[in-house]
Swiss-Prot record:
Recorded coiled-coil stretches: none
Tree of life domain: Bacteria
Encoding gene, per UniProt annotation: cho
Role summary: Incises the DNA at the 3' side of a lesion during nucleotide excision repair. Incises the DNA farther away from the lesion than UvrC. Not able to incise the 5' site of a lesion. When a lesion remains because UvrC is not able to induce the 3' incision, Cho incises the DNA. Then UvrC makes the 5' incision. The combined action of Cho and UvrC broadens the substrate range of nucleotide excision repair.
GO biological process, one term: nucleotide-excision repair
Protein name in the entry: Excinuclease cho
SMART domains, sorted: GIYc
NCBIfam families reported in the protein's UniProt record: PRK10545.1
Amino acid sequence: MVRRLTSPRLEFEAAAIYEYPEHLRSFLNDLPTRPGVYLFHGESDTMPLYIGKSVNIRSRVLSHLRTPDEAAMLRQSRRISWICTAGEIGALLLEARLIKEQQPLFNKRLRRNRQLCALQLNEKRVDVVYAKEVDFSRAPNLFGLFANRRAALQALQSIADEQKLCYGLLGLEPLSRGRACFRSALKRCAGACCGKESHEEHALRLRQSLERLRVVCWPWQGAVALKEQHPEMTQYHIIQNWLWLGAVNSLEEATTLIRTPAGFDHDGYKILCKPLLSGNYEITELDPANDQRAS
């Protein structure tokens, strides 16, 4: 019996036996085993083919042989460069910045989202607010970060469905005063619209459901430095209002990066929120007059 190989099997074997192109092998010898960002360059001097990050640059670069698409990228590559960082945080931040700035051909494009929005809870009402109009690093009672208004309303609707909240009271559909909504008759609404549930109970359940999406307000008055260490390197990441301003080698250099941030940075928030609040890193509050306080 002859067994026919399927297409996915053939693709796997092709990638498995593929070797780095001869002209790239000289770069492999010097690849560091440290955290950082690496870049595959093609013919262009200004636009890399691909930008990646890893806690071990050498291991990650050598693993770029797993799919035919990666093999195709390697064939177009002419050289490999890298930038070492003190750890994973620095690698994540630098990768996100470089991808936005240089828009590599093989990376998913990261762009500034001018429609970035969140749900804001005001007493018993929920509004969709935009980062271009509201300072998301300071505004209270913000929940979720969404690419656009439609995504925000879909998230609110999902919460309403899960918790049997009233579409009408949430502003998702018109509601006639004194009359139950249509979903109440279907037992999909707990009845805050018609007195079966108090508005206070409805508001409490809404707040409890939104809590897992809360956007944390920037907890410091100004900029801070997060210290990240590696046996061969120490970096201080300068951050203000969840925006990464850059990295320096000493606190004395930190004031050169302190400035007024240009706006809330979604990627910075996602990368930095957990490590900044975890208590696992040394955080120093920065004062323009060089009065630093470590915490």
